[in-house]
């Protein structure tokens, strides 16, 4: 029982945006690893479920997401990666989601995004944040080891395929995804890389991605993939959409974006997708958490003699 009460205390602490001890992070990651190692590369998820896109360390907006979508375990969640980088609270964001995963493994599914990578986090903020908040890179190491265990995709009721980025020219079937050895750093190319980096594009066939990794894929590619795997649609994140969600290719691909006012300056709204037990869809749109609920000190107004 003490293990669960410890975990509940850590969850409460993290919900208040307070750090847990380095030793607690180590133990949490060890428990998470035991759970995640059992999950498939195409993790099965049952409806009803609420599907979420990128969070990017925007902790107070994640709290807003839980406010509008319901808390774990009452709501069953699927997060499609990119928990860290760019926002101010990547540590608290990822550790809260991980603690919820350990506490309620059947009520929250976490899949890997392109930012769940050692290389990317050293550039876009998570590494520096761990160093600043803990005084060493040990916590970053624990977390990035867990990244390697995160599933690459999920399938809801056998009908909705969820992945962070998109499709790969090396992959025609879900079974091919199931055979990938995922327990590694995100490679620079190949099928695992493509799943996390690719984007839909109004084109046919495959195109070169301006991101420098993954591919652009067209409507014909999607039609083929969906038919071959007997699925209705692909749900993904990875691209900022100002309205929070966006349909592509006659509603066969959906982008969901869950970081409102991205980077604290883009002015976009965010969305989550609620699927009921019949896979009926309802989008919940939400805005950034109000400034006064946040931990960032609001900038002092510039004195008028500078204007």
Curated annotation (Swiss-Prot):
Positions of Mn(2+) 2 binding: 82, 114, 164, 238
InterPro entries cross-referenced by the UniProt entry: Calcineurin-like_PHP_ApaH, Metallo-depent_PP-like, PPA2-like, Ser/Thr-sp_prot-phosphatase
Subcellular location per the Swiss-Prot or TrEMBL entry: Cytoplasm; Nucleus; Cytoplasm, Cytoskeleton, Microtubule organizing center, Centrosome
Chain's role: Protein phosphatase that regulates many processes such as microtubule organization at centrosomes.
Entry's family note: Belongs to the PPP phosphatase family. PP-4 (PP-X) subfamily.
Gene Ontology CC entries for this record: centrosome; cytoplasm; nucleus
Pfam families: Metallophos
Cofactor: Mn(2+)
Protein name: Serine/threonine-protein phosphatase 4 catalytic subunit
Keywords in alphabetical order: Cytoplasm, Cytoskeleton, Hydrolase, Manganese, Metal-binding, Methylation, Nucleus, Protein phosphatase
Binding-site residues for Mn(2+) 1, renumbered to this chain: 54, 56, 82
GO function terms (MF aspect): metal ion binding; protein serine/threonine phosphatase activity
Catalytic site positions: 115 (proton donor)
Cofactor note: Binds 2 manganese ions per subunit.
Reactions accelerated catalytically: O-phospho-L-seryl-[protein] + H2O = L-seryl-[protein] + phosphate; O-phospho-L-threonyl-[protein] + H2O = L-threonyl-[protein] + phosphate
PTM annotation (Leucine methyl ester): residues: 307
Transmembrane regions: none
Subunit relationships: Serine/threonine-protein phosphatase 4 (PP4) occurs in different assemblies of the catalytic and one or more regulatory subunits.
Enzyme Commission code: 3.1.3.16
One GO term (biological process): double-strand break repair via homologous recombination
């Amino acid at each position: 029982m003490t293990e669960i009460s410890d975990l509940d205390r850590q969850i409460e602490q993290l919900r208040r945006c307070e750090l847990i001890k380095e030793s607690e992070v180590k133990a949490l990651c060890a428990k998470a690893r035991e759970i995640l190692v059992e999950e498939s590369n195409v993790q099965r998820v049952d409806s009803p479920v609420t599907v979420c896109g990128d969070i990017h360390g925007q902790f107070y907006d994640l709290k807003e997401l839980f406010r509008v979508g319901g808390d774990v375990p009452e709501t069953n969640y699927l997060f499609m990666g990119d928990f860290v980088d760019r926002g101010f609270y990547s540590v608290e964001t990822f550790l809260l989601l991980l603690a919820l995963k350990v506490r309620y493994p059947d009520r929250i599914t976490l899949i890997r995004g392109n930012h769940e990578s050692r290389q990317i986090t050293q550039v876009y903020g998570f590494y520096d944040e761990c160093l600043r908040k803990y005084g060493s890179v040990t916590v970053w190491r624990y977390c990035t080891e867990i990244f390697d265990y995160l599933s690459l995709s999920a399938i809801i009721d056998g009908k909705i395929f969820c992945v962070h980025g998109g499709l790969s020219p090396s992959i025609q079937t879900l079974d091919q995804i199931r055979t990938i050895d995922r327990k590694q750093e995100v490679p620079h190319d190949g099928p695992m890389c493509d799943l996390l980096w690719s984007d839909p594009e109004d084109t046919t066939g495959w195109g070169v991605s301006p991101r420098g990794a993954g591919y652009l894929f067209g409507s014909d590619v999607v039609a083929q993939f969906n038919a071959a795997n007997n699925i209705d649609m692909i749900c993904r994140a990875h691209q900022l959409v100002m309205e929070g969600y966006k349909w592509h290719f006659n509603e066969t691909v959906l982008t969901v974006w869950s970081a409102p006012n991205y980077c604290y300056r883009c002015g976009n709204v965010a969305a989550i997708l609620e699927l009921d037990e019949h896979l009926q869809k309802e989008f919940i749109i939400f805005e950034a958490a109000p400034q006064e609920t946040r931990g960032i000190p609001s900038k002092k107004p510039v004195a008028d003699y500078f204007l």
